[in-house]
C-alpha cells in the first residue's frame, strides 16, 4: 500500500506537469517561433494562430482547418481578409507542428505561391466564423478574397498587393484596393 501511495504521488507531482506541456494527441509543442513569426498550434481545435512582426509585412493570421478558412489581418492596409484555404496547397496542421518541433524549415521548402483578389463587399457578421477570427478582425473592416486560378492573368496593380509568407511553406499575395481606404 505504501508503494502504491508513493507511485501515485510521483505521477501527480512529477509526470502531470510535464504532460500538460504536450499537445494532446501528438506530443508536439503547442507554440514556437520561426524568424519573425510566432505560431500557436491548437490541434484539438484544428486551428493555427500566426503573428508575423516583419516590419515589411506585419500581419496576424488564423488558419481554421476545421472550416477551411484563412483570416489575415494586414496591418499595412488596416483591414482583414477572409478566404477559403486550398487544402491541396496549404500545409497541414501536422506539417506545421513538425516544422515547429524540429525548427528545421529547410526540410519544408516553399511549395508555391497563391494570389487572392480582395472583393469589394465587406463581411457583415464576423461571429459566424468563430470567436478567434471575430476577435482578431474586430476593429478593422473585413473583406472576402477569392483565390486566382493558376496561370490566369491579373489586371491588378502590383502595388496593391500585400505579400505574406506562411513559414517557408507558402507565399501569399493578397491584391486589390480596399474600399474606403
From Swiss-Prot:
Read off the SMART domains from this record: BRICHOS (SM01039)
Which spans of this chain does the record mark as coiled coil? none
Q: Where in the cell is it found?
A: Secreted
Q: Which range is the signal sequence, renumbered to this chain?
A: 1-20
Its GO CC terms? extracellular space
Cysteine pairs forming cystine bridges in this chain are 80-137
Which PROSITE patterns has this protein been placed in?
BRICHOS
The reply to whether Signal figures as a keyword in the UniProt entry is yes
* Protein's name in the database: Gastrokine-3
Q: Name one GO biological process term.
A: regulation of cell population proliferation
BRICHOS domain span: 53-145
Q: Which UniProt keywords apply?
A: Disulfide bond, Secreted, Signal
What family does the Swiss-Prot or TrEMBL record give for this protein? Belongs to the gastrokine family.
- Coarse class of the primary localization is secreted
Q: Which InterPro entries match?
A: BRICHOS_dom, Gastrokine
Q: What does this protein do?
A: May inhibit gastric epithelial cell proliferation.
Task: Give the organism the record lists.
Answer: Sus scrofa (Pig)
Gene name, per UniProt, is GKN3
Q: One Pfam annotation, family name?
A: BRICHOS
Amino acid at each position: 500500500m505504501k508503494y502504491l501511495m508513493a507511485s501515485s504521488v510521483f505521477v501527480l507531482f512529477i509526470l502531470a506537469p510535464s504532460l500538460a506541456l504536450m499537445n494532446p494527441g501528438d506530443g508536439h509543442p503547442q507554440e514556437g517561433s520561426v524568424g519573425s513569426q510566432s505560431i500557436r498550434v491548437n490541434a484539438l481545435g484544428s486551428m493555427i494562430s500566426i503573428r508575423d512582426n516583419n516590419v515589411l509585412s506585419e500581419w496576424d493570421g488564423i488558419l481554421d482547418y476545421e472550416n477551411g478558412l484563412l483570416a489575415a489581418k494586414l496591418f499595412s492596409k488596416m483591414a482583414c481578409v477572409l478566404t477559403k484555404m486550398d487544402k491541396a496547397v496549404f500545409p497541414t496542421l501536422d506539417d506545421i507542428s513538425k516544422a515547429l518541433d524540429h525548427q528545421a524549415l529547410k526540410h519544408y521548402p516553399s511549395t508555391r505561391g497563391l494570389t487572392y483578389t480582395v472583393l469589394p463587399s465587406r463581411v457583415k457578421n464576423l461571429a459566424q466564423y468563430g470567436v478567434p477570427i471575430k476577435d482578431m478582425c474586430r476593429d478593422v473592416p473585413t473583406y472576402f478574397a477569392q483565390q486566382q486560378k493558376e496561370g490566369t492573368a491579373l489586371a491588378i496593380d502590383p502595388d496593391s498587393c500585400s505579400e505574406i509568407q506562411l513559414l517557408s511553406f507558402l507565399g501569399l499575395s493578397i491584391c486589390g484596393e480596399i474600399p474606403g481606404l
